[in-house]
Amino acid sequence: MPKANPTRKTKATRETGGRKKKDPNAPKRGLSAYMFFANDNRDKVREENPGISFGQVGKMLGEKWKSLSDKERKPYEDKAAADKKRYEDEKAAYKAGEAEEDEESS
């Protein structure tokens, strides 16, 4: 028996913008431990492998990340935890400010 086709968005749905526009004032999400690692090591990987494609850089960073010990990952995980807290604090302040604006406009 063939699989049922998943429902597809019609052209009309895409044109009307099924997704909400992101508020430019909203806080940026916190980075993961891997993203902190990748940001710190991306230039080094490019220097060691000149002419490497963007995709290959990502693969090499992923392999390096997987080979790190827990002790080597710890500083990046600490940065990620701090960034997550920053995001949650900024998000709470943003939501509180948004709620105040709603009350004032009512």
From Swiss-Prot:
PROSITE patterns to which the protein is assigned, alphabetical: HMG_BOX_2
Protein name per UniProt: Non-histone chromosomal protein 6
Source species of the chain: Emericella nidulans (strain FGSC A4 / ATCC 38163 / CBS 112.46 / NRRL 194 / M139) (Aspergillus nidulans)
Annotated Basic and acidic residues bias: 12-26, 61-93
Assembly information from the UniProt record: Weakly associates with the stable spt16-pob3 heterodimer to form the FACT complex.
Name of the gene this protein is made from: nhp6
Entries under Pfam families matching the protein: HMG_box
DNA-binding region: 27-95
Lineage: Eukaryota, Fungi, Dikarya, Ascomycota, Pezizomycotina
UniProt record, GO biological process: DNA repair
Cellular component annotations (GO), alphabetically ordered: chromosome; nucleus
Region: Disordered, residue numbers: 1-33, 60-106
SMART domains per UniProt: HMG
Family: Belongs to the NHP6 family.
Keyword Electron transport: no
Keywords: Chromosome, DNA damage, DNA repair, DNA-binding, Nucleus, Transcription, Transcription regulation
Biased composition (Basic residues): 1-11
